[in-house]
Amino acid sequence: MNRRQFAGNLGMAFGTLAIGAWTQKSWGITNTPSAHPVVEQLRQIEAKSGGRLGVAIFDSHSGQTYAYRGGERFPMCSTFKLLASAFVLKRVDQGKEQLTRRIRYQKADLVPYSPVTEHHTGAGGMTVAELCEAAITQSDNTAANLLLHSFGGPAQLTAYMRLSGDKMTRLDRIEPHLNEAAPGDPRDTTTPSAMVSSLREILLGGNLSGTSRQQLTDWLLANKTGDKRLRALLPSGWRVADKTGTGDQGTANDIGMLLSPDGAPLLVASYLTGAPGPAAARDAVHAQVGRLAASLITQQS
């Protein structure tokens, strides 16, 4: 079976994904053997960054998961917004929420970096769908806080992750406090392996209905904050559905789904913290991770 036939069998068309193929959990995966070429390349990328890099990659074609520092905790920063939007969609599937419901808020509710919500205070407000879109595509912090409030706060998001089988990911605070990224603080953290497994369940598995899964994928494909990270060095024809995160202490992240021209997805969780220097240097780390991930597909073609 060639890769194009494989993609067709997945039922993929512009990110439409068949369910059921990857429902088996792999929460125990932590690290690929240290002698593996992928690990060595990630180690070299980390060394040049001056920080601590954690990466997990799931190749849907081979079924292989690669991980470097896969079991170590890293600050999520805004990557949690993917999970929060997934939980909103889960509640829609359960009949507990409606994407058309309008949420009204005031100027006093605004927090730093709210490029979308700052224009809709007062009587107008925004729908739940609009808040999800703003949180994912623009990383709007107030939108994320309003979504958290809609389902009961950070603890409820953590509970959703536990019910989904993720025993590691936790959210404890709201924006902007969760971006503190203090070394050794377990609050608002995940591990690369746990996040990739959650992405498998949410984006490729049965956690969401087909309609909700497609909606989440569409929002992620429209993300406007990731051009310099995972997608920056990808070959022509690749598409990326991702969510970035940026915090204090030299922290920058990018997670999501890389779609080859044939449509076969790679799931990537790339977390970096403690990296000195300019933001552009941290962006470049994730760009190199994305290129490395894509090379796994290229080598198999």
Language model regions located:
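Structured C-terminal helix/loop/strand segments within mature extracytoplasmic catalytic/sensor domains
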Residues: N2-G15, S26-L42, H149-S150, P154-A155, ...
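Beta-lactamase-like hydrolase cores
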Residues: S26-R73
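Sec/Tat-exported extracytoplasmic proteins
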Residues: E46-S49, A86-K96, K107, I136-S139, ...
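Soluble periplasmic/extracytoplasmic beta-strand elements of cell-envelope proteins
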Residues: G54-F58, A67, L83, R104, ...
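Active-site SXXK
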Residues: G63, P75-I103, A135, V268
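Short, glycine/proline-biased beta-turn/loop segments that scaffold the active-site neighborhood
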Residues: Q94-H120
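Conserved catalytic neighborhood of penicillin-recognizing serine enzymes
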Residues: L110-L146, P154, D188
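Mid-domain, small-residue-enriched loop/turn segments at the edges of structured enzyme/sensor domains
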Residues: C132, N145-N207
